[in-house]
A protein has these predicted regions:
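Amphipathic alpha-helical dimerization/coiled-coil segments
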Residues: 96-119
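Short, surface-exposed helix/turn micro-motifs that flank interaction/cofactor sites
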Residues: 44-45, 68, 89, 95
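Short, Lys/Arg-enriched N-terminal segment that forms or immediately precedes the first helix
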Residues: 2-18
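Basic, amphipathic "hinge/linker" alpha-helix immediately C-terminal to the N-terminal HTH DNA-binding motif
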Residues: 84-102
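Short, charged/polar surface micro-motifs in flexible loops or helix N-caps
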Residues: 35-39, 69-70, 93-94
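Beta-hairpin "wing" of winged helix-turn-helix
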Residues: 70-84, 89
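Short, hydrophobic-biased segments on the C-terminal half of alpha helices
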Residues: 61-69
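N-terminal helix-turn-helix DNA-binding core of bacterial DNA-binding proteins
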Residues: 17-59
Length: 119
């Protein structure tokens, strides 16, 4: 019986990278919206700029829908160039959540970084 050889290093690396981005993307969107209101089309570019290209959001609608359904962000209607557009903003609940998660995230990242500095 022949076996298909799988590059597990590649799969593991991609899996970790995808999981990291999936976990950190909502926090980055909240961080962005804590600084400024944004149209949905602006969010991916601004997050990419914030992270020096390390995080690229493919599905900002999915992230924003989840954040909105949890009351962490809200949408205002705005008239721009004669068209009604939706602009996203963070809520008070979102700010509280961001503060809590930011502290937790920084602590976790620093702890993991310390493990790698031990070498």
């Amino acid at each position: 019986m022949s076996r298909i050889q799988v590059d597990t290093d590649y799969e593991l690396t991609k899996g970790i990278e995808m999981l990291f981005k999936k976990t950190v993307a909502p926090i980055l969107v909240l961080r962005l919206l804590s600084k400024q209101k944004c149209y949905i089309t602006e969010i991916p570019k601004k997050v990419e700029e914030m992270t020096d290209g390390a995080v690229k959001l493919c599905l900002p609608y999915t992230i924003c829908t989840r954040l909105r359904s949890n009351g962490l962000i809200a949408v205002d209607a705005e008239l721009k160039d004669g068209r009604k557009r939706q602009i996203y903003k963070i809520t008070e609940k979102g700010l509280d959540f961001l503060r809590q998660q930011s502290a937790s995230y920084i602590n976790c990242v620093n702890s993991v970084a310390a493990v790698f500095r031990e070498e």
